[in-house]
A protein has these predicted regions:
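Acidic/His- and Gly-rich active-site-bordering loop/insert found
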Residues: 22-32, 36-120, 139
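Alpha-helical metal-binding/catalytic segments enriched in His/Glu/Asp
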Residues: 110, 119-160, 251-257, 263, ...
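Midchain, well-structured core segments that form catalytic/ion-binding scaffolds
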Residues: 159-160, 164-348
Length: 471
């Protein structure tokens, strides 16, 4: 177990180091580090967008809400300020493009999302948009934006969280051509469809217009996303930046266990068909299975050792919601429903875990004379980040930190992402790479979400360094 004061001490030393600057820096980093644009202005814009909310007292900005449209217009203005040609597509995605010296070449896309969860933090999604605009603004200020060998396009996706319509990646799935037309008729809690929500903002969508949003895979060379880590690893390591090797695949289940409802005082324990007890046993088994998959699953030691190591290091399982009926203190429940969220970098391993869970669940329910039903509500395959793109991002991040601190930085860590990102949708049409940015205590989807000003700077500087390789 680590010393409890080690993490804040490491973070303090790292923050102090990042406040240093040198007279000379890495060749890939501009000599003055562009603090005004890459840190001060970027941070100011993040805080400004953090005030654009549909709610009083907390941040809420869902797909096509009034605050969403206000944020989109602000982002579009900042894109114009950076010298980019801008437009909004029929799914509300905001685009800003620099043609560069060869407009017909394959384009590099840089993006993230501007929608939020309810009671959100101000950095999730927005950080990636703002640092991209800031990095391109530096190139425009220096007169080198039109010298890029490839077009570069920033995309601020309208919806990634899926809060309003319970469908994630509306924006990026439309651009990658993977959004089913049927989703346009999904309704929110007020029975408003996606089509209606867009129309209320003077945006017309149809099957034909949805097809027009899709980018041809042959026109794109790569997709880059800068995002807060949403976890504690970078803070533990005392480093502002890391690169992502892949994004975990995910399965969501809804489990319903039905038993016999009865009086809490009159039904003997041996005669009960208690769905709560069965659900509890299933949940404890799931925890043990996900903590110790190597001991719980059978596998070929020679062929599957690496896969098992990957599964063990990335597998996480969560029961986040439990609902009982009738939910009274003096009643044996008649029904218990709970959710399972299971994520891993190995898709085959994830399926093995699910198979093991289903088998044991069936046994438990039979032993306890209750009925179990399982619905698979969501499945997403793992995404592997492109090795070449990741290598370039890693070199850029290392150079940026070296330039900021003035001390040797051997390398930045290579990490797996347990959270889903727009990069998962974009991976359907192009190579993807991601840069993670440290966030305080690993907290996200919360008002407590926080990124140090200098860490915003480091991310923007790393992206600038990456873009300068195109000059």
């Amino acid at each position: 177990m680590h010393n409890p004061i080690s993490i804040p001490l490491i973070c303090l030393l790292s923050t102090l180091a990042l406040s240093l600057s040198l007279a000379e820096h890495d060749d890939s980093i501009a000599s003055d580090l562009f603090q005004t644009i890459l840190r001060d202005e970027a941070v100011s814009r993040l805080h400004q967008l953090g005030q654009v909310s549909d709610a009083n007292g907390y941040l809420e900005r869902t797909f096509m809400s009034p605050a969403s449209m206000k944020a989109a217009l602000l982002i579009q203005d900042w894109m114009k300020d950076a010298g980019l040609h801008t437009w909004m597509d029929a799914m509300g995605n905001v685009h800003g493009r620099a043609d560069g010296a060869n407009p017909q070449a394959k384009k590099i896309l840089i993006g993230s999302h501007y929608d939020t969860v309810i009671d959100a933090g101000k950095f999730d999604g927005l950080l990636g948009i703002i640092v991209a605009i800031s990095a391109l603004k530096v190139l425009n200020t220096n007169g080198t934006l039109d010298k890029l060998r490839q077009p570069v396009e920033v995309i601020a996706f309208s919806d990634e969280e899926g809060v309003r319509f319970q469908t994630t990646y509306l924006g990026s799935a439309a651009v990658s051509g993977t959004l089913p037309v049927s989703v346009l008729n999904n309704t929110d809690k007020n029975n408003v469809t996606v089509i209606d929500a867009l129309k209320s903002n003077s945006i017309e969508i149809s099957e034909e217009r949805l097809r027009e949003i899709k980018y041809d895979a042959e026109s794109v060379s790569s997709y880059i996303e800068v995002h807060i880590e949403q976890g504690p690893v970078l803070e533990y390591l005392g480093l502002p930046l890391g690169v992502v090797k892949g994004i975990a695949g995910q399965t969501r289940l809804k489990v319903t266990v039905r038993g016999t409802q009865g009086h809490a005082g009159t039904v003997p324990m041996k005669l009960r068909q208690d769905p709560m007890a069965a659900a509890a046993e299933i949940i404890v088994f799931l925890e043990r299975l996900c903590k110790f998959p190597k001991q719980m699953l059978s596998y070929d030691e020679e062929c599957d050792r690496r896969k098992m190591e990957s599964l063990e290091s990335s597998l996480v399982c969560t029961v986040g919601e439990i609902v009982t009926w009738p939910s009274a203190s003096n009643v044996i429940p008649g029904e218990v429903r709970f959710t399972v969220d299971l994520r891993a970098m190995e898709d085959a391993g994830r399926e093995e875990v699910l198979y093991g869970l289903m088998n044991r669940m069936s046994e438990i329910c039979d032993e306890r004379s209750v009925a179990c039903d399982v619905e698979r509500k969501h499945d997403a395959n793992a995404v592997e980040c492109d090795g070449e793109v990741t290598g370039k991002l890693r070199k850029a991040a290392t150079g940026a930190l070296r330039g900021m601190t003035g001390v040797p930085v051997e390398d930045v860590p290579v990490m797996a992402s347990g959270a889903g990102h727009d990069a998962m949708a974009m991976a359907r049409i192009t190579n993807v790479g991601m840069l993670f940015v440290r966030c305080r205590a690993g907290v996200s989807h919360s008002p407590a979400e926080h990124v140090l000003d200098d860490d915003v700077w480091a991310a923007a500087l790393a992206l600038l360094s990456f873009l300068r390789t195109l000059l």
